[in-house]
């Protein structure tokens, strides 16, 4: 028989940097989950990511206070900023440009994000990422 689920916790945790301090500790403590067990398991599972990369994580808490978790791919905005070494997007998207990004770079980001996107092929995934880049005030150029 399957375990009874008591709830889900959605957090954005930096890869390899899970520790019991807020926001992780209080969120897990309210559900009665062993915080150190989660931190050790999360840090072990995210060892292949660059340390500090924000990873959306969904933690499933069961009635016996055990847990399982799934990590998603890093947010598109993080990957876009990392691809062109940008600190932040434009304060006025559509008016002021924060920089330029090549369509080939967007395609690479789309390949990474493909499993988390609601897209059937790489072209539509690239268009989704392109929309995120434009919303950040970036100019998309061919290349």
From Swiss-Prot:
Disulfide bonds: none annotated. One of its GO terms (molecular function) is large ribosomal subunit rRNA binding. GO terms for cellular component: cytosolic large ribosomal subunit. One or more lysine residues are methylated. CDD domains: Ribosomal_L11. Forms part of the ribosomal stalk which helps the ribosome interact with GTP-bound translation factors. This is Large ribosomal subunit protein uL11.
């Amino acid at each position: 028989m399957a375990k009874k689920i008591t709830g889900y916790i959605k957090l954005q945790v930096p890869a390899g940097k899970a520790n019991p301090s807020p926001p992780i500790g209080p969120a897990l403590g309210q559900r009665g989950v062993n915080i150190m067990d989660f931190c050790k398991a999360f840090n072990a599972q995210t060892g292949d990511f660059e340390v500090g990369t924000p990873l959306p994580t969904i933690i499933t808490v069961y009635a016996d206070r055990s847990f399982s978790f799934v990590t998603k791919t890093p947010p598109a905005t993080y990957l876009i900023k990392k691809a062109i070494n940008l600190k932040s997007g434009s304060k006025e998207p559509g008016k002021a440009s924060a920089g330029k990004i090549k369509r080939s770079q967007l395609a690479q980001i789309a390949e990474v994000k493909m499993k988390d996107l609601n897209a059937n092929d790489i072209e539509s995934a690239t268009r989704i990422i392109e929309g995120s880049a434009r919303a950040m005030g970036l100019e998309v150029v061919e290349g």
